[in-house]
Amino acid sequence: EIVNTGLPVVVINQPGGDKDWSNIGEKIWSKETDFDNVTAGQITIYNADGTVNLATATAMTRLRGNTTKDYPKKPFAVKLDKKAKVLGMPGHKRWVLLANWKDKSLMRNHIALGIARKFSEEMPDGIPWNVRGQFVEVVYNGVHIGNYYLCEQIKIDDNRVPIQDEYEK
């Protein structure tokens, strides 16, 4: 059961996995597992007022991070089957759930990204895009796993980093 914290809620139902997450007694997909090999699950996102933001969508969820994936509270990469606008952010397939396990204030990423956005607003010729994010509560396979920071994945794309990919020239 989740208590209303006034934050949006992300509900993930992800079957299978190739790694034990002993803290919650679930299997999860490792970072090394390609999304093509992850069993599809479902994700539903609720606004802070309880209304549906993203109706049950097909999604694949796996661990992310080189170091953070080994912390007790796991960060996740999420890939939707089709682009979707999430919590007021532009539509895309790929999203990130940052666990902020080492940051006891849970504010470091939010503040740093906010400062970067402010710089880009003040410097029109400067940074064309910055990560947007939102604090959420996450329920994973029926287990409330806490407060996370749902944000855009850094990726070359018109809705993300609008640059020419040097490898595609």
Where do the protein language model's features map onto the residues?
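Phosphate/dinucleotide-binding and metal-coordinating scaffold of catalytic cores
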Residues: 1-169
